[in-house]
Amino acid sequence: MRDNIFTHDVKPVKMYREIMNKDGSTSFEQIHGFHAVERASRNDLRDNGEVVYVHPSSYYPIQLEKLEEIAYELEGFGYKITGSGELKDNRLAFIELENDDLPNLKFDGTELNPKMWIGTSHDGSVALKSTIKVVDTWCKNTFMLNSASDILFKAKHTRNSTYRIQDYQNQLRIAGESIMEYYDIVNRLQDTKWYQSKNRKEFANVLGATMKPRKRKKDGKEFWTESMYSGKHANQLVDLDWAYNNSPGQVERGDTAWRWFSAVTYWADHMISDREIESGSNILNGTRARQKAKAFDIAKSYIVG
């Protein structure tokens, strides 16, 4: 029998509200049309569980046992499970897998290795998804490719959570094409000269930061400053500049568009609060994930030819 990847799992449970009866006593009445998603330990019967979300009764959460089942089936195709976790206050779960048949890319300051990422959420933000996560092992930077959600399997978010693993050769073809397309852009970014004078402007574009007069108060009197960035954005711009100059692999990459983009991915993955990591900010559709995607588009715009 296989060991569980996750210590907890989820299930829908009925919801009740407390009501006051005419005689002054209280009782409980079921709330129809909705149910709660309860996360509880698989092995501790004393665990009363926690409610992680509330949904209409028509919504059925995909259990983590199903995610494990998919991962174990993929192991039979040659994948290796390399990581797993829960984020967003236990509302999102994921498993990462590697496969030696998927292509890598290596040059000075960079070594890219792809992983398959499968995940599901209990708040409706991710049904059941598979995508490609590329890791630069020089600096542990990550980037999710915008791949179709049917690379590894076809799935339906229903009570039975049915899925069908794609043909293995078809998996490799679709994944390989997406990865090689990304690598081609990476190589072109590495061949694109970058001038550090562009850093502040383009980092600000990634953040959506704008310079404008700011209202301040001193000695009880309000006044307006000269045009400036907000305090938060000013600090983030300092961090991004540090990442461009000092994060692992940057010197080896030289002054290239790839170095600039790598500064953003390093900042997004490593110069981040524990709270942001827990919220999933740097994966899928989180704030920092969107900033990575925006930086990628900006970097690509500098490619000539």
Residue positions per predicted region:
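A broadly used, surface-exposed interaction patch
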Residues: 53, 78, 103-107
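Short secondary-structure junctions
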Residues: 74-86
